Amino acid sequence: MESEPKPFTQISQGKNKHTKIEEKPIKTNMNKEIKSTINKVKQSRNISLEQLKLLLEINDDEGIRFIREEAVKVCQKTYGNQVLIRGLIEFTNFCKNDCYYCGIRRSNSQADRYRLTKEQMLDCCASGYELGFRTFVLQGGEDGYFTDDKICDLVSAIKEKYPDCAVTLSIGEKSKESYKRYFDAGADRYLLRHETADEAHYKKLHPEEMSLAHRKQCLWDLKEIGYQVGCGFMVGSPGQTVETLYEDLQFIRELQPHMVGIGPFISQKDTPFADKASGTMEQTLKLLAIIRLIHPHVLLPATTALGTIHPKGRELGILSGANVVMPNLSPVNVREK
């Protein structure tokens, strides 16, 4: 008989890349249909549209905590109580794209733009390494200033200085040739949120020149090259429905990524979606739990956006099945830009 995970009571960071998560388990008298559905999803590692609707409609505190606790059990069975720590370096907020939801879209004349130098980025890595970080995530908009040569030079410099570290890139859609160059320079992982797997929904979020088919192809190219790949989506974005979320989950199941990054849509005042309601923490936590039930081995970050909408958002994400946090190593003066 499978043993229950041991109860725990605190969140604490060790001296290297792991954090222990701890919460006392709860007792619940959840209705049989929800319990049965969670067990079926967990066992089949798949979910039907009807099952997704049922789980997303859970709106009582007891029910939400129950699905979160089940997800934590699944996560513990694979990873124990460890949470992986990645150091995030946001090195540019220039972007050629004009996504309707994004604060760094090219049309946003109010954005306070910046670029970090190679030296600044290496300083960020040095600070992170001293703190015990062994993965650095280089994230930025699709900024033409950072040519393939510059990216390759940066990746090579980090790998040369810190050969025991992994380098993750999150710099958008590139050609397969560019992705291969970064990989050959030493990049290990690549994060590219697909944002939505539904064609009509994608068109509501992006201008005409952007294509869901191309974005998906980028993810397949990255996998073929040999990267550990991450995809993901926003929760509560304008036009999102249970049906589009179901498409997201089916695409993730098809892609089988190494990481899935989800977080609430947050309305940004200088975008066309300024007047749209933001996504909720409750729905995000439920979806984190659902993804964990379907994908026991996936790396699942508790994102910055969760921490933005709730002071303990990232901790609650961990206690919903997430197992990665990415503290920001960027210089303090650019973190809010």
What would you call each of these model-derived segments?
Residues 106-121, 128-149, 154-219, 228-235, ...:
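Core AdoMet radical
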Residues 4-8, 21-94:
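Flexible, acidic/Gly-rich N-terminal and inter-domain linker regions that tether
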Residues 162, 194, 213-273, 283-301, ...:
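Conserved C-terminal portion of the radical SAM core fold
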Residues 175-182, 238-251, 308-319:
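Catalytic cores of alpha/beta
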Residues 86-89, 137-148, 200, 266-276:
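Glycine-rich, proline-tolerant flexible connector loops at the mouths of alpha/beta enzymes
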Residues 47-49, 59, 78, 285-337:
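C-terminal accessory regions of radical SAM enzymes
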Residues 79-120:
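Canonical Radical SAM [4Fe-4S] cluster-binding loop centered on the CxxxCxxC motif
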Residues 44, 71, 99, 138, ...:
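Conserved, mostly hydrophobic/aromatic
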